[in-house]
Design a protein with these regions (language model features):
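N-terminal membrane-targeting hydrophobic helices
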Residues: 1-177
Length: 177
């Protein structure tokens, strides 16, 4: 899927949280502020494609892109597993414990990390709708998982994003669930 589509999906999800939880929500005793998470969701949406040198994040971080591509199994390798979101979650817990005395700072840091992680997870989610899939359960299970085979570029990818955002809007308006 194209980077812009990933960003649209990740950012729409973060915006959805802004509408659903305008005052924030509790995550392990720290208030996550969705409006702050929104700031890093788009970066997180781009991040998994650092394993491909021709992508936005791959071009910005060429050396890291080459190394990750080589040791991580190429495109849709290690960066398209749940390993990185789990590492980010552990980092959030560590940050929360370390910054416990500074509640405002803890909330800021956790919100920024949460947004980045949300974008990352939404990137992987969107790639599950491509025939190539993602090795989301690596290293526990080998093989790639995919839900269905939708186009990963062009109008098909944008239609997927539009349908996804429309579902979020329906949920917000109470027309779904």
């Amino acid at each position: 899927m194209q980077g812009k589509v990933h960003v649209a999906i990740g950012t729409a999800t973060a915006a959805f949280l802004c509408v659903q939880y305008p005052n924030g929500f509790d995550l392990g005793g720290v208030n996550v502020i969705p409006y702050i998470a929104l700031l890093t969701a788009s970066a997180g949406s781009y991040a998994p494609d650092i394993d491909m040198q021709t992508t936005h994040s791959g071009k910005k971080h060429k050396t890291a892109s080459k190394v990750i591509n080589k040791i991580g199994g190429g495109h849709r390798g290690i960066t398209h597993t749940l390993l990185f979101p789990v590492i980010l979650y552990v980092l959030m817990i560590f940050s929360q414990n370390y910054l416990q005395a500074y509640s405002g700072l803890a909330s800021l840091v956790i919100s920024l990390l949460f947004g980045f992680e949300l974008g990352w997870i939404m990137h992987i989610f969107a790639d599950l709708f491509n025939g190539k899939g993602c090795p989301i359960f690596w290293p526990i299970m080998q093989g790639k998982v995919h839900i269905m085979d939708l186009p990963s570029s062009g109008i098909g990818a944008w239609l997927f994003a539009i349908v996804y955002v429309s579902i979020l809007v329906l949920i917000i308006r109470g027309g779904l669930f």
